[in-house]
Regions:
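Cytoplasmic helix-loop-helix junction between adjacent transmembrane helices
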Residues: 107-144
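A membrane-interface helix-boundary motif in multi-pass transporters
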Residues: 161-176, 372-392
Length: 412
């Protein structure tokens, strides 16, 4: 199969940039918008709404594998954009009506986001067969996506503050419409994402993979570590977003919180990856690094608890620490699950990973979207972040002590 031209590569990266800018801009304010218009009913409803969105945006494609295999990447991407635009246009009436309608609307939004992300990644894998070219293209689109993640929140917070919610939604919708129009030009037509095995075989084997995982302590440990890490990750666009919005009236500072996270990940990923490689060469496995990342998430939340009392600059420091944890956690999820179950089909492990991340991030979004608005009137949100800090730090400390004890026994 031919390598895509440089112009095609550049066009795909533009699409990634637009999607990332729209996504990060939308999610940096969505929890704030929902809290402002739905929390009058119940802060629990806000948490449930964010949980539904996270669940569908992370894991919905796992359950429509047959449809995905029968559709071209262009069709999948256009369908996803259609769902996104339609759901955003319905968002305002959905927030003012029956809460179940809001849940359905956010589920549709999540499905659209999931389809677009899955189809774009799948298109690159299916179209570019040369591994070096594939890696180079993924590096390019990751860089442009991170750039979009840095710019999107700054622009969105400025537009929201200066011109209001209606124009903000129009701009986000406009970005997705433009991306949809760009898709048939950017993507090669008649490209399909196909698995080597049939959907029936995949379905039966993933069920067996889940069942078998519960029989192995090592696998259960890896699953729990990944699950807790995904809960931590789910805080960024839920509880943390609500705190950011209340810390400053400046749209620049509000947007800066998210931009710092994106920029920090860009700057830190390579040096952190080198440290991980060195540790693995010395015998450490991926699960042990993920548990370490939980401790770093915990430190981040402990700092964040100190900052939410109005010291926004401490929150900036906590975000930099949060980014270090992301740099460790995100690249190692697949590796940890494969290490724990090396005899299982890779496609099942990848789907399994999506399910764990979807449930974990949904739980994190739900907790942040529910508890933070509930505790804020009493000025007690710091307790929530302290509790999360303990959830991350305790396993990391225990794991470290067990590791040291094991090394002493080996030396003796």
């Amino acid at each position: 199969m031919e390598k895509p031209s440089d112009s095609k590569n550049s066009s795909i990266s533009v699409n990634y940039f637009l999607n990332s800018a729209a996504y990060s801009g939308l999610f940096s304010l969505l929890s704030v918008i929902l809290t402002g218009q739905v929390s009058a009913t119940s802060s629990l409803c806000v948490g449930l709404a964010l949980g539904v969105l996270s669940l569908f945006s992370r894991g919905s494609t796992v359950f429509i594998g047959g449809l995905i295999e029968r559709s071209s990447t262009v069709s999948l991407t256009e369908t996803g954009f259609g769902f996104i635009v339609f759901s955003l246009l319905l968002l305002q009436p959905a927030m003012g009506g029956f809460i179940g309608f809001l849940f359905l609307d956010l589920a549709l939004l999540g499905l659209g986001l999931s389809l677009v992300n899955f189809a774009l990644r799948g298109h690159i894998i299916a179209r570019v067969k040369d591994k070096k070219s594939q890696a180079a293209l993924f590096a390019l689109v990751t860089m442009t996506a991170n750039l979009g993640s840095a710019i999107g929140p700054l622009a969105s917070n400025y537009i929201y503050k200066a011109f209001g919610q209606t124009l903000f939604v129009i701009v986000i919708v406009g970005l997705y419409v433009f991306s949809a129009l760009l898709t048939p030009i950017v993507l090669t037509h008649h490209v399909f994402i196909r698995n080597e095995k049939s959907s029936k075989e995949n379905t039966s084997s993933i069920v067996k993979t889940i069942t078998d995982s519960l029989k192995s302590p090592g696998t259960v440990l890896a699953i729990l570590a990944v699950f807790v890490g995904s809960i931590m990750n789910g805080q960024l666009f839920a509880g943390m977003a609500l705190e950011f919005h209340s810390l400053s009236d400046s749209p620049v500072i509000r947007g800066l919180f998210y931009s710092i996270d994106a920029i920090s990940v860009i700057a830190l990923q390579m040096p952190v990856s080198k440290l991980i490689s060195r540790g693995m060469a010395n015998g450490q496995n991926a699960t042990s690094f993920i548990i370490k990342s939980l401790g770093i998430y915990g430190i981040s939340f402990a700092l964040f608890a100190c900052g939410v009392s109005s010291y926004w600059w401490i929150c900036i420091i906590s975000l930099a620490v949060f980014s270090i944890a992301e740099c460790i956690y995100a690249p190692l999820i697949n590796i940890a699950l494969v290490e724990a179950q090396p005899d299982k089909p890779l496609v099942d492990i990848l789907n399994y990973r999506l399910i764990i991340a979807a449930i974990g991030e949904s739980a994190g979004s739900f907790l942040g979207g529910w508890i933070v608005p509930a505790l804020r009137p009493a000025g007690m949100t710091a307790w929530y972040w302290c509790a999360l800090a303990l959830v991350g730090i305790i396993p990391a400390v225990v794991s470290n002590q067990i590791g040291k004890r094991g090394q002493r026994i080996i030396r003796r």
